[in-house]
Amino acid sequence: MAQLGEQTLPGPETTVQIRVAIQEAEDLEDLEEEDEGTSARAAGDPARYLSPGWGSASEEEPSRGHSSATTSGGENDREDLEPEWRPPDEELIRKLVDQIEFYFSDENLEKDAFLLKHVRRNKLGYVSVKLLTSFKKVKHLTRDWRTTAHALKYSVTLELNEDHRKVRRTTPVPLFPNENLPSKMLLVYDLHLSPKLWALATPQKNGRVQEKVMEHLLKLFGTFGVISSVRILKPGRELPPDIRRISSRYSQVGTQECAIVEFEEVDAAIKAHEFMVTESQSKENMKAVLIGMKPPKKKPLKDKNHDDEATAGTHLSRSLNKRVEELQYMGDESSANSSSDPESNPTSPMAGRRHAASNKLSPSGHQNIFLSPNASPCSSPWSSPLAQRKGVSRKSPLAEEGRLNFSTSPEIFRKCMDYSSDSSITPSGSPWVRRRRQAEMGTQEKSPGASPLLSRRMQTADGLPVGVLRLPRGPDNTRGFHGGHERGRACV
């Protein structure tokens, strides 16, 4: 603006006046903009959250915002710039090459599942140099991946890719047994169980038993694919190098006579293995396992005994649970068929069978014969001394408050009130307990049941003992209950 004023108006004074006017106008505009900005921020404008360098519209203020941006950008650029790299010396190169070559060796890859996983993940077998630099033993030597990549240029067994960021072996990585990947070799064992091979194993005139066995295996497995080799392994003899490393995993190798059938394709070995699995369902046949897969596991004797004990414990727990359920069912059945139900059918054959089974299972089942008419088909007079002594201390189902319903049967309510002093109502047969309860109810003077002798001899107007609704019923022409030693026998 000032340069344009100087060109149009050559006079120096005029130029000064124009500059002053422009400056005043700019100041006024700045003040108006500041007032508008203040009012906007007061009204909740989002511009109030902006920094001063980016929120101003004046000609002087933008320099602050741009300067801050330039400064931050320069700092980021400096952070992105990596420090100056220098090539390592020969000693460091040698140590790095030796360490990483050991990482990629067969001996280490067979044990190092992590590195082997990264080798298998890449189709070409490359592994990141940065990943190798992060390994503990390499990190002690250098932390710069460029130093590691420079050292790997001098390796004989390793090679880098085009951008020198990944490395791989020059030779392919073999298939290790612990990878559980199918291979081309099939291990056939238990050869003596095959009927055909057993016939071939008999002494031959020409003595070529091993050749006969190999011919039989070629004929058997040749239908699945092309076979490259068949080897018979004798126990106690030295194993080939490629079989020696799997002998620790497959216990059949070296301990019994077995055969190694190697196919030219993996699919053929897989098909042959599937065929042998179906054929070896019966124990009287030879078996096969695909080398590279997990060997068949045999349960040790301890586990078998443990399984037998666990099975026996399970059967015992089931029998105990069944016993508890039977006892609960017996209690429900006896209460359902008790004397509180006037419509109960004592001659029901189903109830008789249920109670007979309960009496056989439970040693205390004979105690319920005084409470339930369905518990025994026989009858017995109350005058029996044994029945009196045992019947006094028995608990009547009328004492179960949860099963009584006085509103439905007033007769039951009346009888319970009349016979409340009997020992069958109270859980305990002790006379002192009965006296205390009768004193609380205010019926001690009216009730003659305080005496244990009277409670045994008291009878109602119907001729029944106190607390008994009716006598047990049984078939006609019977003499009552048998003695204690004959009670377990069924009545005919």
Curated annotation (Swiss-Prot):
Its main location: cytoplasm. Residues 483-492 have a biased composition (Basic and acidic residues). A motif (Nuclear localization signal) lies at residues 296-302. Residues 24-37 have a biased composition (Acidic residues). Keywords: Acetylation, Cytoplasm, Nucleus, Phosphoprotein, RNA-binding, Translation regulation. GO terms for molecular function: mRNA 5'-UTR binding; myosin binding; RNA stem-loop binding; sequence-specific mRNA binding. This is La-related protein 6. It comes from Mus musculus.
